């Protein structure tokens, strides 16, 4: 079993490094160079995003023996997932599903009337999101080189 919790402010850069590592392995091959640069600029190198994380609007993460192995982040409104990555060697072992279940329970403690969570799924992540109950809301789109399908999870 993995430890699942919100990351601490001193773990933000580790989480972003994990996101970039997994993005480059699994997402980048399907993206134009513009999309790769957009991801880096908007997430990994975004000082505002990093600052918010360090102030407590942090991703949730799974740890195996103290090592961060997966993350799921949300915007501060806690209604939209903005990143989800699991290290390659932990794919298909329930890591991301466990993080999602934990964050959903955590959110519902504070917002019991929340009725949906949204995200923009990458092509690589779409089968996972379908598996845990997200439904596509439109066809795949591309903005600034980032390919995504808007999806919604109804609670």
Predicted regions and their residues:
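Conserved N-terminal entry element of GNAT/NAT acetyltransferase domains
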Residues: 1-13, 154
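Acetyl-CoA-dependent GNAT
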Residues: 9, 17-83, 87-88, 100-102, ...
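Short alpha-helical
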Residues: 10, 14, 76, 123-127
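Short, well-ordered beta-strand micro-motif
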Residues: 61-63, 150-154
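Conserved glycine-rich acetyl-CoA-binding loop
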Residues: 67, 83, 87-101, 122-127, ...
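Conserved GNAT acetyl-CoA-binding A-motif
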Residues: 107-121
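Conserved catalytic-core motifs of GNAT/GCN5-like acyltransferases
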Residues: 118-120, 130, 135-150
């Amino acid at each position: 079993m993995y430890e699942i919790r919100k990351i601490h402010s001193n773990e933000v850069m580790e989480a972003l490094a994990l996101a970039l590592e997994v993005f480059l392995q699994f997402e980048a091959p399907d993206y134009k160079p513009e999309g790769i640069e957009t991801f880096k600029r908007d997430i990994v190198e975004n000082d505002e995003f990093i600052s918010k994380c360090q102030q407590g609007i942090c991703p949730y993460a799974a740890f195996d023996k103290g090592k961060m192995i997966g993350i799921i982040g949300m915007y501060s409104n806690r209604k939209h997932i903005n990143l989800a990555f699991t290290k390659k060697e932990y794919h298909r072992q329930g890591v991301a599903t466990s993080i999602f279940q934990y964050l959903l329970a955590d959110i519902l403690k504070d917002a019991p009337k929340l009725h949906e969570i949204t995200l923009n799924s990458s092509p690589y992540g779409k089968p996972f999101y379908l598996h845990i109950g997200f439904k596509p809301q439109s066809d795949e789109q591309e903005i600034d080189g980032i390919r995504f399908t808007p999806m919604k999870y109804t609670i």
